[in-house]
From Swiss-Prot:
Upper classification of the organism: Eukaryota, Fungi, Dikarya, Ascomycota, Saccharomycotina
Major location category of this protein: membrane
Subcellular location: Endosome membrane; Vacuole membrane
Gene this protein is translated from: YPT35
Protein name as annotated: Endosomal/vacuolar adapter protein YPT35
Membrane topology listed for this record: Peripheral membrane protein
Record note on domains: The PX domain binds phosphatidylinositol 3-phosphate (PtdIns(3)P) which is necessary for peripheral membrane localization.
Gene Ontology CC entries for this record: endosome membrane; nucleus-vacuole junction; vacuolar membrane
GO biological process annotation, one example: protein localization to membrane
Gene Ontology terms, MF aspect: phosphatidylinositol-3-phosphate binding; protein-macromolecule adaptor activity
Keywords noted in UniProt: Endosome, Membrane, Vacuole
Recorded superkingdom: Eukaryota
Length: 173
């Protein structure tokens, strides 16, 4: 690849527990980014197909956007964190979440959502045909967006794995 994409790292965020703070609704408590912002939701968009090198097949890269809003009602505007992830990044993130939750709070394992399914092994001979199909990609995008929102807006998961959430939202270098 001759052209490289330069990515500017977002300003670091800190997820805080504000359970005892009055005036913050329960739905917002689970998505606090720092003392000034909360994560309202995330979007998975802009699927870009990348040609792998030599024997590596083509793969999809998804744009993940987390929307931050100020906690202060007098403040206006919102901020967005953008990062780009492959399906395999979501798989690694989910596996890391499962490992963390199993050790810290085993009863919460069921709160970690499933990811959309990968290409079935018996279709591996036509992997590119299936994995790059527009309908397949549209369904995968919906599943990834559902997954990331269920994770980011779940206070139990964020409380247990703040560092993993922040690491996932950081762009690769």
């Amino acid at each position: 690849m001759a052209d490289k994409v330069a990515v500017l790292d977002p300003e670091p965020i800190t997820l805080l527990d504000t359970e005892d703070e009055p005036g913050i609704s329960q739905s917002r408590r689970s998505s606090i980014a720092n003392s000034n912002f909360y994560i309202e939701r995330a979007f998975v968009t802009n699927c870009t197909i990348i040609s792998g090198e030599r024997s590596t097949p083509k793969f999809a890269v998804w744009k993940v956007t987390a929307v931050l809003h100020p906690l202060n009602p007098n403040s206006s505007g919102s901020y967005r964190i953008h990062t780009y992830k492959r399906y395999s990044d979501f798989v690694e993130f989910r596996n890391a979440l499962l490992d963390r939750v199993r050790t810290k709070r085993p009863a919460s394992v069921s709160e970690i959502p499933e990811l959309p399914p990968p290409v079935k092994w018996y279709y591996s001979w036509k992997y590119n045909e299936i994995n790059l199909n527009k309908e397949w990609l549209a369904n995968r995008r919906k599943g990834l967006e559902l997954f990331i929102n269920q994770v980011l807006l779940n206070g139990n998961i964020v409380d247990i794995a703040k560092d993993l959430v922040i690491q996932f939202l950081r762009p690769r270098k």
